[in-house]
Swiss-Prot record:
Homodimer. This is Serine hydroxymethyltransferase. It comes from Pyrococcus abyssi (strain GE5 / Orsay). NCBIfam families: PRK00011.1. It is found in: Cytoplasm.
Length: 427
């Protein structure tokens, strides 16, 4: 085969993916869709440029336009999140966490994080960035009923362990974490308080969910492509939480510690997204939470076992469903079936699942942020719940449901809460 044919195949698969994705109901909680303006930035000549260090203090020449964009980004991010510092250089949420662990921790230091089954991210784990730094990883006591950290037991743990770092936030995140309650206790023992906002950054930007930096967090790490609807990347936001030497260690850990060049085309996309969120973020975040609640309620009415009923099911973009009663393989059975019907989400461990069940966990994790951005509202959430019922409860042929999903999704092809299309109009 001629090498040009490989190029043609790659372009073909990209085109097919984009066509397929535009006609599916994407409910992956860790994904979103970027606006045409952000796409323009990501596809720009910034992708060819290299920059190391701070704006106007680079180790490379030719950065004058890149510097202007990054300085705009620092201004917008600090305004959006009311932080003293904003570092746009991390290239992912994991990269941001890695920098924090390396900058603030030493091998042997103790860190408290969520357990994987309770929603902790892999970068927090002994086998992830925390463990690679040599940190001694402990996990928060968790209350399955409230689907949250057990505050009383956590207070006791902090005082007994005297950790160097405590981490709030995670990947399974329907309810705010008790930052306000536990941050003062952590600071009593000299711990740094870190909040991993990867999943909820867009909600925080829009004034929903919680406000970690006002509730006691020193540092907020995040990815920029979930509820914050930018290109894949990361960010670190923080207050003047320590002396200059400690803050310099964190900054040094970012560069030259865990990255050199910081993917300038993605950086530019983050900056435009921050501007979009300053303009539209409040409306977007509010609708995300409304849609998540509407979907949870509709799924419960259809007969699904939705987690968190006593607390209104969710306060974030996520809806958690226990499907273990429907099939022995739980989410490992449900997610592929739904994919056949054009409904894309992921299987997920629930707090009572052992890690050995990772491929056949009890749960499904659902996120509504992308479907919200293409203009869907509460009524559409009811339709999505019914599609899921047809596949998983009624055992209807997924291929038949796929046809209905295709035509349903066809009506939602614009990216709202953006300068390109503004706000969606509710009929």
């Amino acid at each position: 085969m001629a090498y040009k044919e490989y190029r043609d195949k790659v372009l073909h698969f990209i085109e097919e993916h984009e066509k397929w994705r535009s006609h599916t109901i994407n409910l992956i909680a860790s994904e979103n869709i970027t606006s045409p303006s952000v796409n323009r930035a990501v596809a720009s000549g910034f992708m060819h440029k290299y920059a190391e260090g701070w704006p106007r203090q680079r180790y490379y020449q030719g950065c004058k336009y890149v510097d202007e964009v990054e300085l705009i980004g620092v201004e917008l991010f600090t305004k959006l999140f009311k932080s003293d510092y904003a570092d746009l250089r991390p290239i992912s949420g994991t990269n941001a966490n890695q920098a924090v662990f390396f900058g603030l921790g030493q091998p042997g230091d103790k860190v408290i994080v969520l357990h994987t089954s309770h929603g902790g991210h892999i970068s927090h784990m002994p086998f992830g960035a925390a463990g690679m730094r040599g940190l001694e990883v402990h996990t928060w006591p968790f209350d399955n009923e409230s689907f949250n950290i057990d505050v009383d037991k956590a207070e006791k743990m902090i005082r007994e362990l005297e950790p160097k770092i405590v981490v709030f936030g995670g990947s399974l995140f329907p309810f705010p974490h008790p930052v306000k309650e536990l941050a003062p206790v952590a600071k009593e023992v000299g711990a740094f308080v870190v909040y991993d906002a990867a999943h909820v950054l867009g909600l925080i930007a829009g004034g929903e969910f919680q406000d970690p930096l006002r509730e006691g967090a020193d540092i907020m790490t995040a990815s920029t492509h979930k509820t914050f609807p930018g290109p894949q990347g990361g960010v670190i936001l923080y207050k003047k939480f320590a002396d200059d030497e400690t803050i310099a260690k964190l900054q040094w850990a970012i560069f030259p510690g865990v990255l050199s060049n910081h993917h300038l085309h993605h950086m530019a996309g983050k900056v435009i997204t921050a501007a979009e969120m300053l303009e539209y973020g409040e409306a977007y975040a509010k609708q995300i939470v409304k849609n998540a609640k509407a979907l949870a309620e509709a799924l419960a009415e259809e007969g699904f076992k939705v987690i968190g009923e006593d607390q209104g099911y969710t306060k974030s973009h996520q809806v958690i469903v226990d499907v273990s009663d429907l099939h022995p393989a739980g989410g490992g059975w449900a997610a592929p079936l739904l994919e056949e019907a054009g409904i894309i989400l992921n299987k997920n461990l629930l707090p009572w699942d052992p890690l050995e069940k990772v491929n056949e966990p009890s749960g499904l994790r659902i996120g509504v942020q992308e479907m919200t951005r293409v203009g869907m509202m509460e009524d559409e959430m009811k339709e999505i719940a019914h599609f899921m019922k047809r596949v998983l409860l009624d055992k209807e042929d997924p291929k038949k449901v796929r046809k209905d999903v295709y035509y349903f999704r066809l009506e939602y092809q614009k990216v709202y809460y953006s300068f390109d299309y503004g706000l969606p109009m509710k009929e």
